[in-house]
């Protein structure tokens, strides 16, 4: 099986959002760094995905902000970079074609935010026929509040929910240690 690791939206833009929290960042950075090293050691492709949108001038995701760049801890070489403007890494990016040209049939998902661009990319990848390994501890998300009723959900609860809805249908749920051991 030929694999590629997708490192989704791990970019400076998030430092400038109202929901940014450093609570889980150290573990996320450690796990993602280990995961990238394991993929590179095993000669698998590592793909950087950046989210940009130019329709909102003052957004930290607008390229003019200067924040649409990898977080500093991602100082390693990537095999390819794709830019997206929607919630998944496939729509209008050329990623699927590139993966197929490189005979890649399995993608591992990592990055920011677990339940948004990472989960959405996993679902689309599955629909496109790729095997998907969702590396939950190499994803990052933040606490959220459900607007209609005010209920708060912690980041760890959101991750569990993401695993629940992806497992056995869209993805195999993995941990970083599954790749480095």
Regions found by a protein language model. Name each.
Residues 1-10:
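Short coil-to-beta-strand
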Residues 10-11, 24, 57:
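A general marker of short, structured functional hotspots
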Residues 3-4, 33-37, 41, 59-181:
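Active-site-adjacent betaalpha module
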Residues 7-8, 44-51, 135:
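Short beta-strand segments at enzyme active-site cores
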Residues 15-18, 55-58, 143-145:
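A short acidic, helix-capping loop that chelates divalent metal ions and anchors anionic groups
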Residues 15-25, 149-152:
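Acidic/histidine-rich helix-loop elements
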Residues 14-15, 74:
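Short clusters of hydrophobic/aromatic residues that line enzyme substrate/ligand-binding pockets
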Residues 19-48:
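A short alpha/beta connector and helix-capping loop motif
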């Amino acid at each position: 099986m030929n694999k590629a690791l997708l490192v989704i939206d791990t970019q400076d833009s998030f430092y400038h959002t109202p929901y940014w929290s450093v609570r889980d960042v150290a573990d996320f950075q450690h796990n993602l760094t280990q995961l990238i090293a394991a993929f590179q050691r095993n000669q698998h492709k590592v793909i950087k995905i950046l989210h940009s949108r130019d329709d909102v001038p003052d957004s930290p995701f607008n390229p003019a902000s200067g924040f649409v760049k990898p977080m500093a801890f991602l100082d390693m070489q990537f095999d390819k970079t794709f830019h997206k403007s929607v919630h998944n890494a496939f729509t209008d990016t050329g990623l699927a074609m590139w993966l197929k040209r490189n005979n890649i049939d399995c993608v591992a998902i990592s990055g920011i935010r677990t339940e948004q661009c990472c989960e959405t990319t996993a679902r689309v990848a599955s629909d496109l026929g790729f095997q998907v390994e969702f590396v939950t501890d190499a994803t990052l998300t933040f606490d959220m509040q459900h607007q209609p009723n005010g209920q708060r959900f912690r980041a760890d609860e959101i991750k569990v929910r993401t695993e629940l809805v992806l497992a056995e249908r869209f993805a195999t749920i993995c941990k970083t240690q599954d790749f480095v051991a």
